[in-house]
Amino acid sequence: DEMNLLIEMMKAEKYFKKEPFEEMGYAKLDTHREIRSGFPEVIFCARKADAHLLEIFTRLYAQDGEVFGTRASEPQYELIREKFPEVVYDPLSHILKIEKKDKKRIGKIAVCTAGTADISVAEEAAQTAEYFGANVERIYDVGVSGIHRLLSRLDTIQSANCVVAVAGMEGALASVLGGLVDKPVIAVPTSVGYGASMNGLSALLTMINSCANGIAVVNIDNGYGAGYI
């Protein structure tokens, strides 16, 4: 009847007037981020105070029963685990997460590294993509110093919907992959290398200046950014 309709309209008005973030004083949780961009807010754990991290983690978990944090330390993991025993921590990628079981994943992303030293950044990309619903094929240590290693996995790489190329040193892997596949290549320069690599700047400049088509470049060591894209 009209009264019930009016009540429902008032409830709807109250809901839409609610701020699209949760005020915490030291933080403003972006509760509508998934509505706007398709994926919920992620915690950048580095340099956060313990009390702040724990409260942010708790409130994000209360929203949807899932939380994903990047650049977490071992002590931060121990802090979160005291309250959330189910939390999972990967010391290689420094990812901290609680993830729903039996999550459906689609497509295939090939995450490739030039060397073993690049795997920590690659895992940040791979686990981010998996958390947000993609299947990931890991293809590690296939850099240009032994191009035959890359060519031995070319069929798998070419069958992917997207390729992530993670490389330090001179960063040539992204250009090589860009010339071999007809899919988007997301290039991730890493800070791996000797003096003149300038903590990843050399690889970044190589990737930005690539003559191969279809390459997009994220910031140095930004595996999360690549996995999100």
Residue ranges and their predicted role:
Residues 152-190:
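Glycine-rich phosphate-binding loop
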Residues 88-90, 177-201, 215:
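Short, acidic/small-residue loops that bind anionic groups at enzyme active sites
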Residues 53, 118-123, 147-148, 167-176, ...:
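Short glycine/serine/threonine-rich phosphate/pyrophosphate-binding segments
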Residues 1-87:
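Long amphipathic alpha-helical segments
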Residues 97, 135-156, 201-202, 218:
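Glycine-rich oxoanion-binding loops at beta->alpha junctions
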Residues 113, 158, 192, 196-229:
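C-terminal binding/interaction regions
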Residues 106-148:
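Glycine-rich phosphate/diphosphate-binding loop of Rossmann-like nucleotide-binding domains
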